[in-house]
């Protein structure tokens, strides 16, 4: 069952050359990237005592905005994307900056099924795919027994519709118009339900919010719009139900 949404691929292919232009269509990702990296590294280093040999998989890596900086810090990173043009952009940037990343044009379905990773990352991707439950199950299917996954996406709330679409796309122009489809936003509770019959549970939810007074992005307990989700194996204790 494919997760590919051809219309989404067509949208991103048109701008795939522009991933590293901080003033271009992906400018907002550059602005939140320091916070994303900080969160990911904090989760990894708090989960693992020894990070020297960890294998990381970045799914839907785009132009490599996460994969390349992680690899530059010494992590062993494999990064995949369905678009060859994204992989070419990511590979070129990494090579020009002397960073080694294993970039592959692939979908999660095409990836070697028995290859497992210590950390699976998927940022701002699941709101752009088809068959989202199977996509998420495929993601967590590549986690090692003691591994973890970090996902980020947008909540399906009225607040997210106003801020994530009307304001971000049409008022401030942070992202191109029609980048997002509100119906494809996911509530954390829906992901919780998708994982009910697996051995994976939600370990943490953390919001990412914009502070207009300081003109900066920061982590928050407010998950009404953008949020991170950290996943791992279920423990013996009862998994807290996610209802939001």
From Swiss-Prot:
SUPFAM superfamilies listed in its UniProt record: S-adenosyl-L-methionine-dependent methyltransferases
EC number: 2.1.1.222, 2.1.1.64
Keywords: Methyltransferase, S-adenosyl-L-methionine, Transferase, Ubiquinone biosynthesis
Reaction(s) this enzyme catalyzes, per UniProt: a 3-demethylubiquinol + S-adenosyl-L-methionine = a ubiquinol + S-adenosyl-L-homocysteine + H(+); a 3-(all-trans-polyprenyl)benzene-1,2-diol + S-adenosyl-L-methionine = a 2-methoxy-6-(all-trans-polyprenyl)phenol + S-adenosyl-L-homocysteine + H(+)
Binding positions (S-adenosyl-L-methionine): 36, 60, 81, 123
Pfam families linked: Methyltransf_11
Gene: ubiG
One of the GO biological process terms: methylation
InterPro entries named among the record's database cross-references: Methyltransf_11, SAM-dependent_MTases_sf, UbiG_MeTrfase
Function: O-methyltransferase that catalyzes the 2 O-methylation steps in the ubiquinone biosynthetic pathway.
GO molecular function annotations of the record: 2-polyprenyl-6-hydroxyphenol methylase activity; 3-demethylubiquinol 3-O-methyltransferase activity; polyprenyldihydroxybenzoate methyltransferase activity
Protein name in UniProt: Ubiquinone biosynthesis O-methyltransferase
Family statement drawn from the similarity comment of this UniProt entry: Belongs to the methyltransferase superfamily. UbiG/COQ3 family.
Pathway(s): Cofactor biosynthesis; ubiquinone biosynthesis
């Amino acid at each position: 069952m494919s997760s590919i949404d051809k219309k989404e691929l067509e949208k991103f292919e048109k701008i795939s050359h522009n991933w590293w232009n901080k003033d271009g269509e992906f400018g907002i990702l550059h602005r939140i990237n320091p916070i994303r990296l900080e969160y990911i590294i904090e989760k990894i280093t708090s989960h693992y005592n020894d990070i020297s040999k960890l294998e990381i998989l970045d799914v839907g890596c785009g132009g490599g905005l996460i994969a390349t900086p992680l690899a530059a810090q010494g992590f062993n990173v494999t990064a995949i994307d369905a678009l060859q043009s994204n992989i070419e952009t990511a590979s070129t940037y990494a090579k020009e900056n002397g960073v080694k990343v294993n970039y592959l044009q692939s979908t999660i379905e095409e990836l070697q099924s028995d290859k497992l990773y210590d950390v699976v990352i998927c940022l701002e991707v699941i709101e752009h795919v088809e068959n989202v439950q199977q996509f998420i199950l495929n993601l967590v299917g590549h986690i090692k027994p003691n591994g973890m996954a970090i996902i980020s996406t947008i909540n399906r709330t009225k607040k997210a519709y106003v801020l994530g679409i009307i304001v971000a796309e049409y008022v401030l122009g942070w992202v191109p118009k029609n980048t997002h489809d509100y119906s494809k936003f996911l509530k954390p509770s829906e992901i919780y339900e998708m994982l009910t019959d697996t051995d994976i549970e939600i370990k943490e939810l953390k919001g990412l919010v914009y502070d207009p007074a300081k003109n900066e992005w920061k982590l928050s307990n407010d998950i009404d719009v953008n949020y991170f989700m950290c996943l791992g194996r279920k423990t013996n204790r009862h998994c807290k139900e996610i209802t939001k």
